Amino acid sequence: MMELYIGSHLSTAGGWNALLERSHEEGGTAFAFFPRSPYGKRSKALDPAGAAAFGARLKAEGYGPLVVHAPYVYNLAGKDEAKRTFAIEALAEDIELLTAIREAGQEVYINIHPGAHVGQGTETGCRLISEGLNQVFERTTGVMVLLETMAGKGTECGRNFEELATIMNGVENKANVGVTFDTCHVLDAGYDLVHDYDGVMRQLDEAIGLAEVKAIHVNDSQFGLGSHKDRHANIGQGQLGIPFFTRLVNDPTMAKLPMILETKEQTPTTHRDEIALLRGLVD
């Protein structure tokens, strides 16, 4: 039986030790967190001096890769040059913080929403994202950046595999960029994971390469195929359903990757229960 690296997106309140205790409470072996406020510029109270010890402890406890989530406010594709510059500088700072974890032996990625072109057009948006990442990697290359598959709402870039491939092809340091596969977003974007799982995986492999997928956001979908809504549902309570998640956790290529739950906490034990549910689906 394959052991899943799985957990949820956790609060950093209380610092590194409190973060790990929350993971223990839900029975996780991987998790995500925001390195600073997800909606604003204020940094969270994570002591850089404690990062290395945190990484060493995770490594000793056998954790899978961390999938840290960059703040939503970052928009590498935006019209405003000052905001793009902020995103570049802040993302580089986040990577520097996380590099200490990686250097302690614990694998860690930082996941970003690629960005929204806000009316400039997809081609311009994808180019700006690539250029922004190139500037980030001129400053630091300590941690791989993962581009998240998007649902396609508004003017999001990365709404299909080809757009993500375009962004990645524009990055000079290709070893530093990969993909996070969000199950809700992929279905909402129009890929039929329920009835054509193998076909979707072939499309992903042809456009990007399965080897470039480094993490999974494990979410059910409220609205489903082609809705472009980006509304997560709890596992088994949406349009993807338990048969899809059974297929996912028994797919040798995907099941070895860190899986991060971003579902709503309906009760204090929601994520603990969902982690147990997904582990119970493994053959």
UniProtKB/Swiss-Prot annotation:
Disulfide bonds: none annotated. Pfam families: AP_endonuc_2. GO terms for molecular function: deoxyribonuclease IV (phage-T4-induced) activity; DNA binding; DNA-(apurinic or apyrimidinic site) endonuclease activity; phosphoric diester hydrolase activity; zinc ion binding. Zn(2+) 1 binds at residues 69, 113, 148. Zn(2+) 2 binds at residues 148, 182, 217, 262. It catalyses: Endonucleolytic cleavage to 5'-phosphooligonucleotide end-products. SMART domains: AP2Ec. Its EC number is 3.1.21.2. InterPro entries: AP_endonuc_2, AP_endonuc_F2_Zn_BS, Xyl_isomerase-like_sf, Xyl_isomerase-like_TIM-brl. Binds 3 Zn(2+) ions. Its cofactor is Zn(2+). The keyword Ubl conjugation does not apply. CDD domains: AP2Ec. Keywords: DNA damage, DNA repair, Endonuclease, Hydrolase, Metal-binding, Nuclease, Zinc. One of its GO terms (biological process) is base-excision repair. Zn(2+) 3 binds at residues 185, 230, 232. It is an enzyme of class 3 (hydrolase). HAMAP family: Nfo (MF_00152). Belongs to the AP endonuclease 2 family. Endonuclease IV plays a role in DNA repair. It cleaves phosphodiester bonds at apurinic or apyrimidinic (AP) sites, generating a 3'-hydroxyl group and a 5'-terminal sugar phosphate. This is Probable endonuclease 4. The lineage of its organism: Bacteria, Bacillati, Actinomycetota, Actinomycetes, Bifidobacteriales. The gene is nfo.
